[in-house]
């Protein structure tokens, strides 16, 4: 849509160049002597143009580059014709009307429009200029703006001194059959930039002429109303507009679209996708997210590829799209499976979008906590979207069962099951990780077995992220440490059995089988890292099982709760489609009237159909929560329907997406009339 509108404006700019070509193509009128010089150069003879009929800056023909033709050019003065071979340029001068026919128009070329203009005429000296678009051939010659599309009419009187910039206020007129659509415009003297362009209505199909032949999005019918373009942005209302998107059709669309510097946004659209109710909300940014948008790469990207995949689902009942931030889109699908209805929520992440980053959050900022809702963590940390995280000790300590990296720091050590790690380039690794580290004291070395785990096993490192208090734990001893110079050197400040709660400081806890003894004042060395190492890791979270590996269902041998494999209930996962695209996907469950849920194999199959090459589940069941910033909101909110009496569960941690881009400026709400439902066409 942006590319088509740009071409329309470029065309209008070329027409205004023609109008202003009466005096101002290169920002200043060419003096009569220059015209004479060009004519002499072309004809090889003197030309008398002294008559006032040809002067006054009302018109000249310098833009036709008469003197540039290799073949002779003939001029019959005073009311005859300028003709030239090569470009087949001719000018017929017959007062009071000047008619110019152009096979190749350098005025259009000057405006950056490689088109062939059939003819225009200007009533002399101060009347309308009419451009008769008998045929405008676009690059390649396979697309044209034919006479059936109408006539542009430009009215205005851009007379100005030759040493100042002129502006043009006038009206373009598009005729489509018997209907006439005026377009008010203001242009600079060189015709290359519009200050404004307004139209009460334009047929959407008129834009198809300016669409490249291989474009995936093609306007078919309907109207654009209240078009208002200013400089690089504008808005318009869709009124029953139909687009063909690849092999699919979006039709009966209503709503407001917003054009801005390469992106098209919408506060609200409603219509049908292949007969399925479709709606979209929010503002789309420079990277298109909604399936019917045209992208300069001529590929459907982000949610668009998702749209094409989902549209092929025979059980699809409805589609909803909106956008959260540049590079981040939200989609929701209502589907019908053989087991009952399904509600699928999807966050699509453009891994190449520089304003997006991943991180994790932990309940109340501590490993041991009272739990916190995913949405509350998102609001507290100013996230724009996210999902719940790892399995956890529900109702007690709320500590996550698996690993956690927050802000590049290892906060909770891994266990013997899957986790995912995300680096600063938003590359994701699904694997089983371990903690590799040692505590060295008095010439002895002890392997670290865990980080911020309680009660402590053999040797566990405790950091301030653990919580405010170390609970009592029989048989566990805690040695508090303070820096002793150097990155990994510490001094023991106290050693105490964990027979009663005590304040948390950095230190080492060891169980009865650790066979380690530390004394106050002793110097120790503490080192630990993830194994395998992931350079530049910024976020990591535990979960599992791995559901998809190399594009196929994967039976994870270390799946948590293996007896839940065939439960049909809420499930959620992070999936990698490519190095450029990630998906967070949630399937609601335990709502027979809305969504019955999916088994792990069923969910893996859905992820594969969405394009996943690799995917890992997170904590499922009642914990499944997806949040994002809805259009018009400043903070995140729950977008799916959790299964705990439709209420959000308190959890241990969450995986979030953050954006440094400014919050979108929303266009005014559309007055949209949703078309009545209609049956899906037979396959």
Question: At which residue positions do the language-model features occur?
Answer:
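Gly/Ser/Thr/Pro-rich low-complexity, intrinsically disordered segments
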Residues: 301-683
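Terminal hydrophobic membrane-targeting helix
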Residues: 20-102
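Hydrophobic residues on conserved beta-strands that form the core of alpha/beta folds
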Residues: 47-49, 61, 75-77, 88, ...
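Hydrophobic membrane-insertion alpha-helices, especially the h-region
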Residues: 9-24
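Elongated, acidic membrane-bridging lipid-handling scaffolds
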Residues: 73, 77-78, 84, 111-206
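Generic short beta-strand segments
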Residues: 62-66, 94-98, 132-137, 169-171, ...
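Broad, structure-driven detector of short, well-ordered beta-strand segments within folded domains
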Residues: 75, 80-82, 150-152, 183-189, ...
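Strand-loop-strand
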Residues: 167-172, 254, 260-276, 281-304, ...
